């Protein structure tokens, strides 16, 4: 009996349908490690089963018929037993495959493969052929200069709007206050004992080349970063015919390229590099560590350098949601779908972008729009109807903002809810006011994720009776049961190093950016509010509140 696991999105979506792919949320959110969160397809005795995270599982409604479903992970809602054990990816696969050998596609990310191999025997198919590489060097100072030149120009263009925000004068200053560049990454590598990093995800390689991810992907680039060195080494499958990339040689493949670099230890992106690609590196004798934390922490620490892009993205979302609300109100008696609301939202975003010189530089990496009656999971907007009778319609919107060279410099993660009932709307607005007036100002450098979560839950206590009166707390549960995050830091993708959750010891630092949020899912009600903040020594400053600067 042969059990096959297909990992490439091309194969999985080819089998399960394009509409299924369009409804997936998390492969878009995890821009640097899509396949580490994407569904996989397991075939056993002629039966196909998709293995998918619960957060993305609403997409299974539209996959082709005749395919089974195995779900792992857990997404918070009040009706679940959050103390129950959480099923892992490997368990979900083994529940289908059994204890025997799994024939696994070599495209699976290394970290997923390692978890699967710990659960039982695994063999690989579809191994990649070695690819010759062109080797280049680029001065990191040139990349940092590109960052500053584009940042300063965009900050000047957007300053008139930022000045209108509450605390606008401080926020305007913050847009050009720091230029940390690669410095924090040097320090993190030294702290962790990493003499070199090898970066493979196009989303991350952008920041080491000054080229947009699409160009990185087309050229087949990876980069070798050595802390403190003036040049970054770039490996490319195709020639790079640019004067700022100095050609220094060629090599037969990645194993030779890394083997030649004289390092005993190299940190790699284990959540991105495929097990097939990694298999070729065994002959090098190098010990490969995981670079995920160092990359995320660096991006968190340098996000303040690019504050203008985060300020723009967050406020563009709010303008878009305003446009969608107005469209919904005008057409409330007609037939409207979630995608109609998204179209109206993007029109509002585009108007805002054109006004401040960001036209053609704004993209979407998630559009979560749906009623609480449709699902409590973070589902991408689809062809589902929305009606005035829907008690809540959630918007949780992710935009990317690029600089003039096409490199993504900032993103949004902002949420609001259309509420049909006055009491629910009042509660939504109260939660939002708690975020911007109480929780965000309480965030200070040196606080852990657990400490911020504790404050966030404490601020909910005065509302507990109101939640209960409105039927928004199950019998026997109180606000202490709010085990969802109250927010997180943010960088060039939503995935970051600090989440405001119980048990998280990682700390926020001065100059970091992030989002605070409350998401309240129960029954057919889904209330979501989320606002952006900048960490300062005096406390956090919200950058999504209009008012006198």
Report residues per predicted region.
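Active-site neighborhoods and metal-handling regions in enzymes and metal-associated proteins
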Residues: 1-549
